[in-house]
Amino acid sequence: MTNPVSALSDMSVSNLNGNQSSRQLQILLANETVRVGKRLKIDVVPFGGIEADIWADAGQKNVYKELDRILAEKTGGGDWRPSMAQDVLKGRPTEIMQMNGFVSSQGKSIGINTPINDVVTKMIMDIDKRLIKPSFTNIENIMSFS
């Protein structure tokens, strides 16, 4: 889930994992994504070194804390940016509709709310259109409403 969060914030992955708000956003995105996938009977493979069922249970306080701890431990792993953030930096269109936009549309089709994927998709589309700029403020704005 680092792809859109890095693109939104213009932060490297190691910096994302060092920030509580960006870790929270990654966890919420992963939770919605796995819940949609499981409802669609998709075999969601582990990602980020973590089993899909754990991401699906991120709404439980103890599970959320463990996920947050795991992500925080990945801080300092290098100053790299995933493909979507590189697209933003180079002014290329992103793959947001094939990723988070897909989760949002599939969620709607099966009655699962995906408010975090919805807003992230909209904001990345606005970045693609150059209506807003990538900034950590984007993450803060999303988290203030969640």
Where are these regions (language model features)?
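Active-site-proximal catalytic alpha-helix in oxidoreductases
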Residues: 1-17, 21-36
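NAD(P)-dependent Rossmann-like dehydrogenase/reductase catalytic/cofactor-binding core
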Residues: 25-146
